[in-house]
Curated annotation (Swiss-Prot):
Induction: Constitutively expressed.
Natural source organism: Nostoc sp. (strain PCC 7120 / SAG 25.82 / UTEX 2576)
Family: Belongs to the CpcS/CpeS biliprotein lyase family.
UniProt superkingdom: Bacteria
Record bears the keyword Glycoprotein: no
Residues in the signal sequence: none
GO BP terms, alphabetized: protein-phycocyanobilin linkage
Activity vs pH: Optimum pH is 7.5-8.0.
Effect in UniProt of substituting R147Q: Reduced lyase activity, reduced binding of PCB
Keyword set includes Cell inner membrane: no
Full protein name: Phycocyanobilin lyase CpcS 1
E.C. code: 4.-.-.-
C-alpha cells in the first residue's frame, strides 16, 4: 500500500478511543473522540495553500487530507476540538517516504512538518520534531473498519508519554477490496 491509498482508506467518520500512559507521573488517562477524515486530491486548493506555506512546489504533493476531531480526555472537562489539513510530499528517490506537512500540529498548535514512511506491512509511521518535543506514531488497519495507532511523545526535558488508540469506522467505508488487502498485509 502507498501513502495515497492509506489516506483514501482512512477517509470517513471514526470513533477513537485512546489510552495514554504518562510515564513520569506513572498514571494513565483515557480519551474519546469523533474523527472525520476527508481525503483531498493533490491539486485541492487547501493542499496547494499548505504547500505554499512551507514553500514547497504544489506539484510535489501527492495527496492530502482534512482531519477534524471533537473529543474529551479523562483528566479535564474541556472539549478538545479542532481540524487540520495534511499534505504528503514524497521523496523523489523513494515515494514510500517523504515529508508530511501539517497546517497545525497535534502536540503544539502551530504548523509543523514531519516525516512519513509506509512500511511493507501497510503501516504508516510518522515522525515529528517540534520545538520542545519529538513524537513517533505508527498507524495500521487491523480490518477495513478498525484502525490502530501507537505513539510515543518525548519532551526534551525527559517527560514522555505512550499512547494506544483504536479507531472504529462509523461511516464512509472505503472500497472493500483495498481495505481487506490492507488489513491482510498488516496481519501477516
Amino acid at each position: 500500500m502507498n501513502i495515497e491509498e492509506f489516506f483514501e482508506l482512512s477517509a470517513g467518520k471514526w470513533f477513537s478511543h485512546r489510552t495514554s500512559h504518562h510515564l513520569a507521573f506513572k498514571q494513565s488517562e483515557d480519551g474519546k473522540s469523533d474523527l472525520v477524515i476527508e481525503s483531498l486530491a493533490a491539486d485541492h486548493p487547501e493542499v496547494i495553500k499548505l504547500c505554499e506555506l512551507y514553500e514547497v512546489p504544489a506539484s510535489a504533493a501527492s495527496c492530502g487530507a482534512r482531519v477534524s476531531w471533537n473529543g474529551t480526555m479523562e483528566w479535564d472537562e474541556e472539549k478538545h476540538t479542532g481540524s487540520t489539513v495534511l499534505a504528503t510530499v514524497p521523496d523523489v528517490d523513494n515515494p514510500n517516504e517523504g515529508r508530511l506537512l501539517r497546517e497545525m500540529g497535534y502536540a503544539e498548535k502551530a504548523p509543523v512538518a514531519g516525516r512519513y514512511k509506509m512500511g511493507d506491512d501497510g503501516a504508516l509511521t510518522l515522525t515529528t520534531e517540534y520545538e520542545t518535543m519529538w513524537s513517533e506514531e505508527r498507524l495500521w488497519f487491523a480490518s477495513p473498519n478498525l484502525r490502530m495507532r501507537v505513539s510515543v511523545l518525548k519532551r526534551f526535558g525527559g517527560f514522555s508519554m505512550a499512547s494506544f488508540t483504536s479507531e472504529i469506522r462509523m461511516g464512509g467505508s472505503p472500497a472493500a477490496a483495498k481495505a481487506e488487502e490492507a488489513a491482510n498485509s498488516a496481519s501477516s
